[in-house]
């Protein structure tokens, strides 16, 4: 049970970490596997010391202990969602964890990848796993903003205008090939993405909660496309790529899909209400002053770098903070570490900066890696 792949632990340096490990193992001992020096811990010895660890933890506040337990339960629930999605999507666990971090942070995701790599199935599998309403829009040059948001239709028999909701009124929306629509149509999503509402003819209507936009675009085929404006691309919490499967993963795909589509048999493991609670919980994840300073130093460096025409704005700073909080919670921690900040640097910031070498592939990623190498990560305690 202890050899199952799980989320990385990081350094275990305080009694709070021990309590967190015990909580996770008590909920489901197959849920967590210790890594690094934790592999040396004998399972029997650890559980034999449960009482001592819990007594030591009583020196902290009840609120801290409750948060640790809630985070352990949340991480277990997210693992259940991931395991459910993995029945449809083979591999890509790291991508899914980042996508879930953006979702729980209240953001949206831009998937830039080749056709046929499983982007649509990923969105559908996530929606099915949380019992959410799924919507899909195929963006084309002739698509109108009203086709996205909805419009008022005059009912002649009643003599009134009646609002017909567009496909954005759902929980998880797949905006397929978003860069094929005109900028006017693309702009119809701005209010949805940022304010979670739609305004038609001066009347604003709240969207369903939770709402998560997964937009896709083809990185190679550019004929007949309209590049996303900075104002819109900045509203995506992360830009991710699933990539092609490995040989082992592709063989598993063949075996899994040789008969029925596993997506049709997928059952929900939680509800949208559970997701809303997880979104609230991730905002309570602790971020120490040293980690906050480290995060802001990275942001400031993007504005001062000679190779960048535009750095990250304050909206990006807040998105970065919320994403690392969610990412820490997904890994079962009630606090953020510098490794979380490093891990999400490129997915969260890569699409928000403009490089003078924009025509060169991977230039922004290289600049961000350079910034990470130049700024020393904090080494002091990150827990409360």
Model-derived features with residue positions:
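Pre-Walker A (pre-P-loop) alpha-helix and adjacent loop at the N terminus of AAA/AAA+ ATPase modules
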Residues: 72-109, 114
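Conserved alpha-helical scaffold flanking the Walker A/P-loop in AAA+ ATPase domains
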Residues: 98-101, 154-174
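C-terminal engagement/docking regions of AAA+ P-loop ATPases
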Residues: 304-384
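N-terminal amphipathic/hydrophobic targeting modules at extreme N-termini
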Residues: 7-11, 15-26, 31, 36
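Canonical AAA+ ATPase core
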Residues: 155-160, 181, 185, 193-270, ...
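Short, positively charged and aromatic/hydrophobic N-terminal segments
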Residues: 10, 20, 33, 40, ...
